[in-house]
Amino acid sequence: MTYRECVLEVARDDAEALSEALFDLGALSVSVEDADADTPEEQPLFGEPGHEPTRLAWNRSRVVALLAEDADPALLVAAAANEINLSPLPAYTVREVEEQDWVRVTQSQFEPIHIGEHIWVVPSWHDAPEPDAVVLELDPGLAFGTGSHPTTRLCMEWLEQHVHPGERTLDYGCGSGILAIVAKKLGAGETVGVDIDPNAVEASRYNAERNHVEATFALPDDAPEGTFDLVVANILSNPLKLMAAMLCARVRPGGRLILSGVLERQAEEVAAAYASTIPLTVWRARDGWVCLHGVKPT
């Protein structure tokens, strides 16, 4: 069976209404995506702590409608636009989509990810590419990160170059646990991952177990106390600014702090939030994102 995929780029205020109209008029499925995803202009889905939540959709939204083979995309788009009084008609593209074994197709699209010198993130259906590699087995599709985003890669590259054996390490905002797990595999000592999302904590525990890593993952109120030799936080700029005092307090004198999830244009203001306690500099930049690092004075 063949389907048709119709992709429309629309303004934020029209995305939800157009999606509902397309679905009401016979689309098999409709999704809304950030047209600027994976660029420096991407927007957090639900906003950042301390900022107004994102509205119903992104500034530039992409509406993707899956249609039956015999559907007429032009008529459907025109009818949907008319239903919500949208003028002029949005630009759209259409492509044919063959029915396939989607599990196999998805797996074929994800190859092992090489990060730094010897780190590989490997889906469960692949073997490790190098016998001496530092391998993390993580499957794509996790909501909490698999190493493909520039900020995650930057943090992993930093860890590969700078982790010292036995260092007590904290991954704050651990998501999938990927940074805590790689730190442990690189020789870190006691390793703790913290996240405000219980699902992320559970995902991290699962990933640590499948990677044969001993680490503690917990919600903030349940996390081990004390200071750490190494604190890494790959979150977003505004929560990083809001949590500056707390994160600095978690770093022991002489310990190191690594931050990412920060756009190049945000680096100066994020560093300013930490300047009174830990001076931060840009370690490396990639694709509009930066990794900041610094040492807490003794």
From Swiss-Prot:
One of its GO terms (cellular component) is cytosol. Pfam families: PrmA. Methylates ribosomal protein L11. The keyword Disulfide bond does not apply. The gene is prmA. Its EC number is 2.1.1.-. It comes from Ralstonia pickettii (strain 12J). The lineage of its organism: Bacteria, Pseudomonadati, Pseudomonadota, Betaproteobacteria, Burkholderiales. Keywords: Cytoplasm, Methyltransferase, S-adenosyl-L-methionine, Transferase. InterPro entries: Ribosomal_L11_MeTrfase_PrmA (IPR050078), Ribosomal_PrmA_MeTrfase (IPR004498), SAM-dependent_MTases_sf (IPR029063). Its main location: cytoplasm. One of its GO terms (biological process) is methylation. It catalyses: L-lysyl-[protein] + 3 S-adenosyl-L-methionine = N(6),N(6),N(6)-trimethyl-L-lysyl-[protein] + 3 S-adenosyl-L-homocysteine + 3 H(+). S-adenosyl-L-methionine binds at T152, G173, D195, N234. Belongs to the methyltransferase superfamily. PrmA family. It is found in: Cytoplasm. GO terms for molecular function: protein-lysine N-methyltransferase activity. This is Ribosomal protein L11 methyltransferase. It is an enzyme of class 2 (transferase). The keyword Methyltransferase applies.
